[in-house]
């Protein structure tokens, strides 16, 4: 019996991934909103560091993001919490986001500069 107990723990740890609860955003939608959140954070960083902006429009930007994506803050936060409790799945999502962000960056860098 003592030898079987560690084996049971290993088997339990290797079981199939838990499906997200029904009230969460689906993976594709969550990834899209998370991409938008990364762009919001980049914009805020740009405004604060480069433009020395003193007001803090973070709530406005996130409200606009959630409205554009047709999700609520609560849906996003519940889904985010779920994936933080499933780090392997969250890591996979972030790896996909990095690819998408790199693609967006390349598209911006390749744009011709328009004189003012």
Language model: regions and residue ranges:
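Post-signal peptide N-terminal segment of mature Sec-exported envelope proteins
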Residues: 23-44
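Compact alpha-helical subdomains of small soluble proteins
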Residues: 48-116
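Bacterial signal peptide processing site
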Residues: 15-18
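C-terminal motif of bacterial Sec signal peptides marking the signal peptidase cleavage site
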Residues: 10-13
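Sec-dependent signal peptide recognition
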Residues: 1-8
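Short helix-to-loop capping/linker segments positioned immediately adjacent to catalytic or ligand/cofactor-binding
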Residues: 20-23, 47-49
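Residue-level detector of secondary-structure boundary/capping sites
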Residues: 5, 25, 53-56
């Amino acid at each position: 019996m003592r030898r079987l107990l560690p084996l049971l723990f290993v088997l339990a740890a290797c079981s199939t991934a838990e499906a997200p609860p029904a009230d969460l955003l689906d993976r594709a939608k969550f990834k899209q909103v998370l991409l938008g959140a990364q762009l919001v954070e980049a914009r805020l960083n740009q405004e604060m560091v480069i433009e020395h902006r003193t007001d803090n429009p973070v709530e406005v930007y996130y409200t606009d993001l959630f409205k554009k994506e047709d999700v609520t803050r609560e849906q996003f936060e519940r889904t985010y919490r779920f994936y933080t409790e499933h780090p392997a799945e969250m890591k996979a999502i972030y790896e996909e986001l990095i690819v998408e962000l790199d693609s967006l960056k390349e598209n911006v860098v390749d744009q011709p500069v328009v004189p003012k």
